[in-house]
A protein has these predicted regions:
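Binuclear metal-dependent phosphoesterase catalytic core
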Residues: 93, 100-170
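His/acidic metal-ligating clusters that form di-metal
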Residues: 13-15, 24-101, 181
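Long, low-complexity serine/threonine/glycine- and acidic-rich segments characteristic of extracellular
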Residues: 144-246
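A short loop-to-beta-strand structural motif that recurs across blades of beta-propeller domains
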Residues: 119, 317-320, 358-360, 400-403
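Extracytoplasmic beta-rich repeat domains
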Residues: 284-298, 308-317, 329-344, 369-390, ...
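Blade/loop signatures of beta-propeller domains
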Residues: 251-282
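Short glycine/acidic-enriched loop and turn motifs that connect beta-strands
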Residues: 265-266, 310-314, 357-358, 401
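Short loop/turn segments that connect beta-strands within beta-propeller blades
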Residues: 323-326, 363-367, 406-410
Length: 434
């Protein structure tokens, strides 16, 4: 096929252009691409939407300039540009760059360079030229798993509403969407049906709800059978057997704070000094409202902190705090983009960095933003590394953006000047020695 081409569907003009560099020299120049682009875009209709494709990102900043040389420049913002799709960086990443989406998807066969799972992306453009996306995870057969109530455990009623059993289910299928999830609660001794119904979708993976429990089921061993129905007609089923005790009281044994990955900034693996004994009993489960990637939860001040990721244009991304004992949501702070990796806590402050290179410091009690910094990666647009904090200093960023910040004020203490970064290993910063 041609090296570059364009086509129209509805009110959208799609333009596919080639990369200007690679393992071997090309038989075309950026000037050749510029000349074709200029002529092609001169023919589009007024107010027609424009969506661009290229192997690489045109510009990491918001300028959206195509530059062949100083005398041959095209400004894509002069058109009704809606998005640019690219793949060179090998990660899953969506940015809203001042009204234009840049959308990158990792490789289908092996996932992203940043450990992103294998995936593909579904993109829709409606009659009003609005773009929606859904990242689909690959190679997953129809599956379903019951998160709560857990198999062979005792389950209690909700702490807020009496006689209601909380239910949480994870289900997914690569080739089709989950249309609905149903449940049947039955007596495990005689298989007599007690109640049945449907669960509600919480995220693309999780469905949940509560079951109104009859009073005469107290203390009985019950079976919960859940079934996922997928849009192509396939199904998946799972069963959990448990004992229902309405007033079952769980004992919480609090250990030391776990304020960063592996408990300390050296990531040497924290020591659990609590008196926990096996087997463990699920105390609570909750849903953050979005997916979680490499961010492990941290615990401090009787709170559990976690951050979420969303690789779609919805950018449903948050830093969340939950009550340690009940799982109740205490606060939620919306970030500009996905927090892909570890977060940290010290002296009442939670710190996190998102994929768009924003560094946040939040008050752990209220979730209020204390300060925010922009991490400059010197033309590289994506931050997937984890940060840490130690003795009042936040260590964040990577490469040209690797910096130390005062935890209380956000003031920059130092910035790395010795080396830069590109695509490579995904890390969490570690404090070693003094």
């Amino acid at each position: 096929g041609p090296t570059w081409y364009s086509f129209d569907i509805g009110n959208v003009h799609y333009v596919v252009t080639p990369i200007d560099h690679g393992d071997n020299p090309t038989n075309y120049t950026q000037r050749d691409v510029y000349n074709w682009l200029k002529n092609d875009l001169a023919l589009i209709k007024k107010d027609q939407a424009l969506i661009l494709f290229n192997h690489d990102l045109f510009t990491p900043n918001d300028s959206f300039i195509f530059k062949a040389d100083d005398d041959h420049i095209l400004n894509f913002r002069s058109f009704n540009t809606k998005a640019q799709l690219y793949g060179h960086m090998h990660y899953n990443y969506v940015r809203n760059q001042n009204g234009i989406y840049t959308i990158c998807t990792g490789t289908l066969d092996k996932g992203g360079i940043d450990h992103s799972p294998s995936s593909f992306r579904e993109i829709k453009v409606d009659a009003n030229d609005n773009i929606t996306t859904q990242l689909r995870y690959a190679f997953i057969e129809p599956q379903i798993a019951i998160v709560s109530p857990m198999n062979n455990q005792t389950a209690a009623a909700c702490t807020i509403t009496e006689d209601q059993l909380p239910v949480s289910v994870n289900t997914y299928y690569s080739q089709a969407k989950t249309s609905h999830v149903s449940y049947i609660l039955s007596d495990s001794e005689n298989n007599q049906e007690i109640v049945k119904g449907d669960l509600a979708s919480r995220t693309e993976w999780n469905w949940g709800g509560t079951i109104q429990m009859p009073a005469n089921e107290m203390g009985k061993r019950l079976n919960l059978t859940v079934t996922s129905f997928f849009s192509n007609g396939k199904k998946a089923t799972a069963t959990s057997q448990f004992i229902y005790q309405k007033d079952f009281k769980l004992s919480t044994i609090a250990g030391e704070d776990w304020n960063t990955l592996l408990q300390n900034a050296a990531h040497s693996g924290g020591v659990n000094n609590s008196q926990i004994k096996l087997p463990l009993q699920l105390q609570w489960t909750t849903n953050t409202g979005s997916n979680i990637f490499m961010c492990s939860p941290i615990i401090a001040g009787q709170k559990v902190f976690i951050a979420t990721t969303d690789d779609n244009v919805s950018l449903n991304t948050f830093i969340c705090a939950f009550d340690f004992n009940s799982g109740k949501l205490l606060w939620k702070f919306r970030t500009a983009n996905s927090v892909k990796n570890t977060i940290a806590y010290e002296n009442g402050i939670v710190v996190a960095q998102d994929a768009s290179c924003n560094l946040y410091a939040l008050d752990s009690e209220s979730g209020k933003l204390l300060w925010k910094q922009s991490i400059n990666l010197d033309s590289y647009p994506y931050l997937t590394e984890g940060l840490t904090v130690d003795k009042g200093v936040v260590y964040a960023g990577i490469g040209a953006g690797l910096s130390a910040y005062n935890l209380k004020t956000g003031q920059t203490i130092w910035t790395n000047k010795d080396w830069k970064q590109r695509e490579g290993s995904t890390t969490t910063l570690t404090i070693a020695g003094d």
